Curated annotation (Swiss-Prot):
It holds the Pfam family RNA_pol_N. Zn(2+) binds at residues 7, 10, 44-45. The gene is rpo10. This is DNA-directed RNA polymerase subunit Rpo10. One of its GO terms (cellular component) is cytoplasm. It is found in: Cytoplasm. DNA-dependent RNA polymerase (RNAP) catalyzes the transcription of DNA into RNA using the four ribonucleoside triphosphates as substrates. One of its GO terms (biological process) is DNA-templated transcription. The lineage of its organism: Archaea, Thermoproteota, Thermoprotei, Desulfurococcales, Desulfurococcaceae. Its EC number is 2.7.7.6. Part of the RNA polymerase complex. It comes from Aeropyrum pernix (strain ATCC 700893 / DSM 11879 / JCM 9820 / NBRC 100138 / K1). Keywords: Cytoplasm, DNA-directed RNA polymerase, Metal-binding, Nucleotidyltransferase, Transcription, Transferase, Zinc. Binds 1 zinc ion. Belongs to the archaeal Rpo10/eukaryotic RPB10 RNA polymerase subunit family. It catalyses: RNA(n) + a ribonucleoside 5'-triphosphate = RNA(n+1) + diphosphate.
Amino acid sequence: MLPPVRCFTCGRPLGHLWPRFRELVASGKTPGEALDELGVDRYCCRRTLFTSVTYIEHAAKYRVGIHVPPERLKMWG
């Protein structure tokens, strides 16, 4: 999942806040403190940023695509 571009409920743009949010949390602030510092007041926007997880690191470990054995390909023509 990519970082959210907009709030799923109200549509407020949030994509520009994602890098700073991750940076603040990595520096030791709680997610709530980071959201307060970024000025995210609406609970729907806070939920969208707080619950977003990037899975790209996990997905990159797996190969994309399906291996089809040659004998199965002959079966289709």
